[in-house]
Amino acid sequence: MADGGSERADGRIVKMEVDYSATVDQRLPECEKLAKEGRLQEVIETLLSLEKQTRTASDMVSTSRILVAIVKMCYEAKEWDLLNENIMLLSKRRSQLKQAVAKMVQQCCTYVEEITDLPIKLRLIDTLRMVTEGKIYVEIERARLTKTLATIKEQNGDVKEAASILQELQVETYGSMEKKERVEFILEQMRLCLAVKDYIRTQIISKKINTKFFQEENTEKLKLKYYNLMIQLDQHEGSYLSICKHYRAIYDTPCIQAESEKWQQALKSVVLYVILAPFDNEQSDLVHRISGDKKLEEIPKYKDLLKLFTTMELMRWSTLVEDYGMELRKGSLESPATDVFGYTEEGEKRWKDLKNRVVEHNIRIMAKYYTRITMKRMAQLLDLSVDESEAFLSNLVVNKTIFAKVDRLAGIINFQRPKDPNNLLNDWSQKLNSLMSLVNKTTHLIAKEEMIHNLQ
């Protein structure tokens, strides 16, 4: 505290009135000796009496030493009931010094790590969490104790309870906690929420992390953990473009770039997920940026696959399966497959989505090169039935990816976008002016010819 003052539990800042350090130096060794002889209760009563004097005199250092000594003696004597009882008693004493309580709690936190008997450990954690509740000056210790408790609950199979306990912590508001530790806590909260399939809460918690933090040194492990959790979250949401961005962030991480196998797997996932993402301006821009990556040369099959989706030509699904199916789903010795199109329920769904992306690509190409086309011809080009083709076309029109009007009676699709009335009027006016100028010029030339003939 400023000017050597100590803060009491009620918030008052007080100065030390009497220095008891010499008395404490003398009494503590005597008490330790008596405690080892089994006279613990007598020692505690003596120390509590001394603690009252040091506390009243606002001697923070001496009070801290006494509080730490009491809990230490109880711990060494394995008097667990006495330990819990004294923690509660000492923290609630009238006008107790905050720094002294903080020192005692910090000492007890080391005992939590050392105790192996689970019921005793849980009781001590419970006592310490009760003592630290609502106290800002021991918020970090409370957070660490809560994390330990959540870990124990998870190990015992009660993941739901572990997630619930850890969610109590609003660590993003803990100014005294290091940024790195705060991020570790938030990532643990995300992991447990995903484990209990609480995706909405995971999404909310993920927003508490500013990704600029991962640009700092020694944050690569946390960065990879964060993006892997985000991939799991977006897999559930089916947001392929977001997954692609997460894999790009993983791919750009120096420790991934350092290992050929790892960056290749990450880049393969980037390519596959950007292809799986429905077409829009952002997806199109990302496809072209990924296409410019020189490292794609080292995974030629994936480079060629990406090129198919940037080339303004129709693709046949059967040809694509023949050329790339084995590589994408099973891989080869030189190029292992990713888990994107694995033989799982999710893998099969993504494989089906890839076929949908091929169909959508082909319809966009038709909209570019055709003004009108029959339904039968379009279905033939897409290798689909008429009904399936119409369903895909309708979906693209609804998403405003293309413009089309279907005459179902005639079986004709019109891709020509109707012109804006103002533009139409301007075009008509311009053409009319051009026509009148031509008529005027023609009339003038006829008159000129007549005059020449009359002179002759």
Swiss-Prot record:
The record lists the organism as Bos taurus
Q: Gene Ontology terms, cellular component aspect?
A: cytoplasm; cytosol; proteasome accessory complex; proteasome regulatory particle, lid subcomplex
**Residue location of crosslink Glycyl lysine isopeptide (Lys-Gly) (interchain with G-Cter in SUMO2):** K92
Q: Which PROSITE patterns match?
A: PCI
Q: Which InterPro entries match?
A: PCI_dom, PSMD12-CSN4-like_N, PSMD12/CSN4, RPN5_C, WH-like_DNA-bd_sf, WH_DNA-bd_sf
Subunit structure, as described in the record: Component of the 19S proteasome regulatory particle complex. The 26S proteasome consists of a 20S core particle (CP) and two 19S regulatory subunits (RP). The regulatory particle is made of a lid composed of 9 subunits including PSMD12, a base containing 6 ATPases and few additional components. Interacts with ERCC6.
Q: Which residues carry this modification: N6-acetyllysine?
A: K221, K368
User: Which UniProt keywords are given for this protein, alphabetically ordered?
Assistant: Acetylation, Isopeptide bond, Proteasome, Ubl conjugation
Classify the source by domain of life: Eukaryota
Q: Show the PANTHER family listed in the entry.
A: 26S PROTEASOME NON-ATPASE REGULATORY SUBUNIT 12 (PTHR10855:SF1), 26S PROTEASOME NON-ATPASE REGULATORY SUBUNIT 12/COP9 SIGNALOSOME COMPLEX SUBUNIT 4 (PTHR10855)
Q: What's this protein's family per the entry? A: Belongs to the proteasome subunit p55 family.
UniProt domain PCI: residue ranges: 242-420
Q: Report residues of the Glycyl lysine isopeptide (Lys-Gly) (interchain with G-Cter in SUMO1) crosslink.
A: K92
Q: What is the lineage of its organism?
A: Eukaryota, Metazoa, Chordata, Craniata, Vertebrata
The record's annotation in Pfam families points to: PCI, PSMD12-CSN4_N, RPN5_C
Instruction: Specify the protein name.
Output: 26S proteasome non-ATPase regulatory subunit 12
